Amino acid sequence: TNMSLKDFAFEIASSLEKVDSNTSRSLNELPHRLEEVIPGIINDSKSTNSASLLYAIKKLNFDGNLIICGDPRKEPKSYEVYGPQQVYIFGMHRNELMEKVKSRRSNIKTFSNLDLVLQDIKKADSKPNILFSPGNSSGKDFKNFEDRGNFFKDKVLEYFSDWKAHFFW
């Protein structure tokens, strides 16, 4: 089924917390919930657990570069990621995440920081196809998901703003 990003965001928000469809707060005000930074690059920093991460991959039928980070201590067991061609793990919790995240199709690469991840993607791909859906709490890397999402957005614009013009209608 084809679903708009706004409808998809509402569906995810509804599944994670009680959402009143008549609420005065617009879905556009939900920070970093499937936010398209530039075409081909989605910021889902609001994803703070494996269930929301796996749901986003499935709903978007995502097969590009997945970036995850954060503290996996709240995840009771390991989980398998299906779909993405490449999984990138970065940050202070990358070793713990490597023990939790499994992937049959994907190569998993780890880096100490987001800059190195984005440099690797830019070097390898002719066009960006990125889902930043951490799937964990921020842990030691960021203050919260909003801080994390803003940082990701700034870095994407730093590394891919020259590609932006190629993807607008």
Regions found by a protein language model. Give the residues of each.
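ATP-dependent carboxylate-amine ligase
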Residues: 1-19, 25-169
